[in-house]
């Protein structure tokens, strides 16, 4: 029934909105949730759905940071306009590694790692990395405390870390936040740049997935359009709150709790897989 599918879409939209911005892997969570609560749709639609609903989450970034990201915003000084254009150039530079490396190999990684055990291993591994990085940085002073002082080289290196998220379960936001902190930015700068970098990255990735879906001869039924719309709208609304929460959270806390969460979740998934396949 359509109402059941829409309720599933609503819940998946909540999952996307929460996990897209927290460093815990949104795609991994969507895949895992659908292990227990599957959409009654074709495999090709579900694969496209898991990526395209990220557009709802991205719109939240644009709404929240529109004035900051808009170089044509009335009232901006010449210096502010210049800094805005420089920020966009840094974002574009950070996208280059994904275009050159992640994009050509995306289908291969999706075919070989888009399963529960690889996702669980990625969750656990980067959970330990988060904890290690936070312990290492506990008494270190960040070298970059404002986006305006971030160099183009630093932006490029953060983009290189983003490539790691090609492996399901890694987390795009997690990879870029980790990379930024390791390189020497503050947590606030790492979070903000992660939000901004997501705009072209996820618009491009979602757009490519949608185009591929239609080029393969698929069409969207009215029911599927409603499912996609509901999930995207919910992801947008939830993201508005989660982004504000995270920007406030990183001012007073580190990311250790997310590392611990990843380790616990990954361990439970491995245990679940063993129970299902061995007993």
From Swiss-Prot:
Pfam families: BacA. Its EC number is 3.6.1.27. GO terms for molecular function: undecaprenyl-diphosphatase activity. The chain crosses the membrane at residues 45-65, 85-105, 113-133, 188-208, 226-246, 255-275. GO terms for biological process: cell wall organization; peptidoglycan biosynthetic process; regulation of cell shape; response to antibiotic. It catalyses: di-trans,octa-cis-undecaprenyl diphosphate + H2O = di-trans,octa-cis-undecaprenyl phosphate + phosphate + H(+). It is a multi-pass membrane protein. Its main location: membrane. The keyword Manganese does not apply. GO terms for cellular component: plasma membrane. InterPro entries: UppP (IPR003824). Keywords: Antibiotic resistance, Cell membrane, Cell shape, Cell wall biogenesis/degradation, Hydrolase, Membrane, Peptidoglycan synthesis, Transmembrane, Transmembrane helix. It is an enzyme of class 3 (hydrolase). It is found in: Cell membrane. Catalyzes the dephosphorylation of undecaprenyl diphosphate (UPP). Confers resistance to bacitracin. Bacitracin is thought to be involved in the inhibition of peptidoglycan synthesis by sequestering undecaprenyl diphosphate, thereby reducing the pool of lipid carrier available. Belongs to the UppP family. This is Undecaprenyl-diphosphatase. It comes from Streptococcus agalactiae serotype Ia (strain ATCC 27591 / A909 / CDC SS700). The lineage of its organism: Bacteria, Bacillati, Bacillota, Bacilli, Lactobacillales. The gene is uppP.
